[in-house]
């Protein structure tokens, strides 16, 4: 287990789940983001990486990537509204490039410097 994985595991769950075809944050997702934003406010040198996925039947690769980007940007916007500078948030839209786990998700990774 890497240092990053150890640090991320302290904030379980570290994944936002989305309804199929949707990029709207659920109340549960907002609660998770609230915990991460509180931690980022304390740890001013830490950064957040958002890795977004979208996997659905009959969804083309380009549409999956657009949907995953929309999900990542929803999470990013929520963090920014909670006082986290945009320069501390990295977004990766990976579309349907997942081999394990829930395909409709955003993984949250806290990166400590």
PLM region descriptions:
Residues 44-58:
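Short glycine-rich, basic-tinged beta-strand/loop micro-motifs
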Residues 1-47, 105-113:
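Periplasmic peptidoglycan-binding/tethering modules of Gram-negative envelope proteins
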Residues 30, 54-113:
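Periplasmic OmpA-like peptidoglycan-binding domain that tethers envelope proteins to the cell wall
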Residues 17-21, 39, 53, 63, ...:
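Broad hydrophobic/π-residue packing in well-ordered secondary structure
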């Amino acid at each position: 287990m890497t240092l990053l994985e150890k640090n991320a595991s302290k904030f379980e769950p570290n994944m936002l789940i989305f309804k199929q075809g949707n990029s709207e944050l659920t109340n549960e997702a907002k609660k998770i983001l609230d915990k991460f934003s509180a931690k980022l406010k304390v740890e001013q040198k830490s950064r957040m990486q958002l890795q977004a996925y979208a996997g659905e039947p009959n969804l083309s690769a380009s549409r999956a990537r657009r949907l995953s980007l929309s999900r990542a940007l929803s999470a990013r916007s929520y963090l920014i509204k909670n006082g986290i500078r945009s320069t501390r948030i990295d977004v990766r839209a990976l579309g349907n490039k997942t081999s394990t786990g829930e395909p409709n998700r955003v993984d949250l990774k806290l990166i400590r410097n």
